[in-house]
Amino acid sequence: MLQTSIKKIHGKLKGSNLNTAEVIVNSFKRAEQVLELNSFISMNNNAGLQVESSNEYFKNGKPRSLLEGIPIAVKDNFCVKDTLTTCGSKMLQNFRPKYTATVVQKLLDSGAILVGKTNMDEFAMGSGTTTSIFGPTKNIWGSRFSNLCIQEKNDWFIPGGSSGGSAVAVASGICLGALGSDTGGSCRNPASYCGIVGLKPTYGLLSRYGLIPLVNSMDVPAIMALNVEDTACLLGIMMGRDENDSTTVSKNLNLALNYSSSSVKGLKIGIPAEYNCQGLSDEIRSAWNDIAKVLYQGGASIVPVSMPHTKYSIVCYSILNQCEVASNMARYDGIEFGLRSKEKGNRKNSYVTTRYSGFNEVVRSRIIAGNFFLLSSNSNKYYEKALKVRRLIADDFNNAWRKGINILLTPTTLTDAPKYSEYIKKDEREQSAIQDYCTQPANMAGCPAISIPIELSKKGFPISLQLMAPKFEEKTLLGCALYIENAVNFKNMNEQ
């Protein structure tokens, strides 16, 4: 039931061919069936109340939006009032916020029904959804729930991260849409590995209020769905100015797309040479070339472009990430909220033991590195220099836009989903340099980017590509993505 579009389910609900209770029961049953994938940290025990409310709107013939009665999932770093919001960390394992994140509230006010909170890397620091205190999430592709089970005992394929729980929830048919967050690719990476659509909107288009921060200058609420149309629907509901987030802008983007006859005629598509990098698989390189041909045949012009500072981007991103992490993590001191050590003695000892026991090694290492970069003797060598390089990276994008480029076409990830046993051979810092190579520049520049599935690899796993566009050009971005989606006709998990 939930491997179709929001519009189709809404039509059945509106036409009384289906009721909200059936949809949500189906969602929870599916979650139970694939429980071992560990995509959720907690389920919403109050979903029944939302179902009753939604049914009333349908009975009165006044559904609030296309999302009325539609099941959604939310990554566990978005606050939901009086609901466990853990960030996958021991530090917040009992934290229940007193307010709801703006983007979540907009979804709920539009009639969407929250199924649960999804698993994630601890504090969103990771690219595999392998570091949560609730255990790792497993990719449905290659599992016993897929048509091609090649998962070995005590091993599996990672879903990507850090929003892997949301990606698996959508890919496995538990919900029709999910919220993730994207700081350096945390939505697009798992979307790529799980064969779904993942959108990182322009920085400032969606409110960050209620999103527990990782890197304030790059964090963006992100959208995961089965198709481009559903992605646009979710974006349209959540975007807009929020007085609780000073970085948001008043932009009412027209996202109306012609879903039956999308076109790329006249678009100028840039192919950045620097993304043809070491480690890029031949299969993804081939898919990249094939889609460039598809766009050319559709009337777009294909233009080679250079983004010369891309090679510095991952190092620059790493430094800025760790500096902001060190600042943001300082609030978890065991005094105001979160875990508090039972260590007796002075406040300093309590502070140290709280943070040591509350954070995993990945988080602690980023805090230490960030504080090192921010030392007065080091700040100008690392932090300030990284800020300057970030400006040069943003200028690379701006130069492309000034030359008339409408869309940049690149890989999302360098390979298809790796096995867990292979992934953990490198630590998270090394993996970040690999997994985020193609995705984090868009966060550095603040521009929108989308990952869309293209085809299956030889081993039967999704291969995806990324599109990037100028700030607030989401309509162009989604339109181009829709054209590719229609051209490749990628089949989701249950359609394979």
UniProtKB/Swiss-Prot annotation:
Its main location: mitochondrion. GO terms for cellular component: glutamyl-tRNA(Gln) amidotransferase complex; mitochondrion. The keyword Transcription regulation does not apply. It is found in: Mitochondrion. It catalyses: L-glutamyl-tRNA(Gln) + L-glutamine + ATP + H2O = L-glutaminyl-tRNA(Gln) + L-glutamate + ADP + phosphate + H(+). The active site is at residues 75, 162, 186. Gene3D superfamilies: Amidase signature (AS) domain (3.90.1300.10). One of its GO terms (biological process) is glutaminyl-tRNAGln biosynthesis via transamidation. Transmembrane segments: none annotated. Its EC number is 6.3.5.7. GO terms for molecular function: ATP binding; glutaminyl-tRNA synthase (glutamine-hydrolyzing) activity. SUPFAM superfamilies: Amidase signature (AS) enzymes. Keywords: ATP-binding, Ligase, Mitochondrion, Nucleotide-binding, Protein biosynthesis. Belongs to the amidase family. GatA subfamily. Allows the formation of correctly charged Gln-tRNA(Gln) through the transamidation of misacylated Glu-tRNA(Gln) in the mitochondria. The reaction takes place in the presence of glutamine and ATP through an activated gamma-phospho-Glu-tRNA(Gln). Subunit of the heterotrimeric GatCAB amidotransferase (AdT) complex, composed of A, B and C subunits. This is Glutamyl-tRNA(Gln) amidotransferase subunit A, mitochondrial. It comes from Pediculus humanus subsp. corporis (Body louse). The gene is gatA.
